[in-house]
């Protein structure tokens, strides 16, 4: 099965971007709660 590189990159970005956004948002709220 031939893998489409653009499809792999698009899927990776589609997963990584929201995940990193939620992670940063969680870290911000956690740091605010600590202080």
Swiss-Prot record:
Coiled-coil zones: none
InterPro entries documented for this protein: PSII_PsbM, PSII_PsbM_sf
Keyword Manganese (UniProt): no
Gene Ontology terms: biological process: photosynthesis, light reaction
Pfam families: PsbM
Subcellular localization: Plastid, Chloroplast thylakoid membrane
Primary location group: plastid
UniProt entry keywords in alphabetical sequence: Chloroplast, Membrane, Photosynthesis, Photosystem II, Plastid, Reaction center, Thylakoid, Transmembrane, Transmembrane helix
Annotated Gene Ontology cellular component terms: chloroplast thylakoid membrane; photosystem II
TM helices/strands, residue ranges: 5-25
Topology within the bilayer: Single-pass membrane protein
Assembly notes: PSII is composed of 1 copy each of membrane proteins PsbA, PsbB, PsbC, PsbD, PsbE, PsbF, PsbH, PsbI, PsbJ, PsbK, PsbL, PsbM, PsbT, PsbX, PsbY, PsbZ, Psb30/Ycf12, at least 3 peripheral proteins of the oxygen-evolving complex and a large number of cofactors. It forms dimeric complexes.
Family of this protein: Belongs to the PsbM family.
Xref: PANTHER family: PHOTOSYSTEM II REACTION CENTER PROTEIN M
Role played: One of the components of the core complex of photosystem II (PSII). PSII is a light-driven water:plastoquinone oxidoreductase that uses light energy to abstract electrons from H(2)O, generating O(2) and a proton gradient subsequently used for ATP formation. It consists of a core antenna complex that captures photons, and an electron transfer chain that converts photonic excitation into a charge separation. This subunit is found at the monomer-monomer interface.
Name assigned to this protein: Photosystem II reaction center protein M
